[in-house]
């Protein structure tokens, strides 16, 4: 009996020392922290004030709060000495003021022939960059297995979440993101060898985002085919591509979602397309 009791104790100790068990025991929702770092460049001061007035980081904090994470994740805006960039590193998602400056500068003043408004071209890429970097953070924090390039998986993570908004909002966000990719694709690459980059080429990301959107709702995005934005040959497999992402999100990410908080997030009206 004593030996059996000893075995039980050792087994319990072994179970609780298992890294996977320890990580799960620490998981909880509402682990998001935020930081607006005052810009060094005075040209970014209006953008800094606008982001604070609009409570942009507070909204992202609430939107991501259902994620059950093992430790805190910080979201922050800061100046990057002229570098237009965004990244996840050391438990923090950083988006540069320069990056948002480019988004505002590149957004069209008038509605485009494709129906993209200035607000679409600002809100879409703004949400996408945070959700893309959040994808990297989630993969790291939760040790999510990724088959293929992590950058592609982060794009899919972001696009999937954009498509969970109300249909009319989701359409505008996706078209705003596609506008940004298409604009980047039209410019000469500044990289020495863009084919060696960990990211897909802007043109590839453009078609991938449209394909996921069409696969999610063929009726809502039917005009992508009619107007020639998405080739019919690619469109034929888009429903399967989207379903594959849904299965991955359901199996790999959903177990780490606090459903009570997620319900509140889903019920909230998030977007106001009033950006100038």
Spans of features found by a protein language model:
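Pan-zinc metallopeptidase signature
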Residues: 24-34, 192-276
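Bacterial N-terminal signal peptides
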Residues: 6-14
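Short alpha-helix carrying the canonical HExxH Zn2+-binding catalytic motif
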Residues: 119-138
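Zn2+-dependent metallopeptidase catalytic core
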Residues: 48-72
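Acidic/histidine-rich, surface-exposed loop or edge segments in extracytoplasmic proteins
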Residues: 27-48, 138-140
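An active-site-proximal "capping" alpha-helix that borders the catalytic cofactor pocket
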Residues: 147-166
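Catalytic zinc-binding patch centered on the HExxH motif and its immediate surroundings
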Residues: 77-94, 99-109
């Amino acid at each position: 009996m004593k030996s059996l009791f000893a075995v039980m104790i050792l087994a319990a100790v072994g179970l609780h020392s298992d890294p996977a068990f320890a990580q799960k025991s620490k998981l909880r929702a509402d682990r998001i922290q935020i930081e607006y770092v005052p810009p060094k460049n005075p040209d970014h001061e209006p953008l800094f004030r606008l982001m604070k007035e609009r409570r942009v980081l507070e909204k992202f904090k609430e939107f991501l709060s259902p994620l059950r994470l093992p430790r805190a994740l910080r979201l922050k805006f800061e100046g990057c000495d002229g570098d237009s960039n965004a990244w996840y590193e050391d438990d923090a998602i950083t988006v540069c003021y320069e990056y948002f400056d480019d988004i505002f500068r590149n957004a069209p003043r008038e509605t485009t022939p494709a129906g993209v408004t200035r607000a679409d071209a600002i809100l879409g890429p703004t949400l996408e960059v945070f959700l893309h970097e959040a994808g990297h953070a989630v993969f790291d924090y939760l040790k999510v297995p990724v088959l293929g390039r992590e950058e592609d998986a982060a794009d899919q993570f972001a696009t999937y979440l954009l498509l969970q908004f109300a249909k009319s909002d989701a359409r505008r966000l996706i078209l705003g993101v596609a506008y940004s990719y298409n604009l980047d694709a039209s410019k000469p690459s500044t990289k020495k060898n863009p084919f060696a980059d960990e990211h897909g080429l802007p043109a590839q990301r453009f078609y991938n985002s449209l394909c996921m959107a069409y696969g999610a709702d063929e009726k809502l995005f039917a005009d992508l085919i009619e107007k020639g934005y998405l080739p019919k040959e690619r469109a034929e497999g888009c429903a399967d591509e989207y379903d594959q992402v849904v299965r991955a999100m359901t199996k790999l990410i959903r177990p780490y979602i606090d459903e009570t908080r997620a319900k509140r997030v889903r019920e909230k009206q998030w977007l106001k397309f009033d950006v100038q």
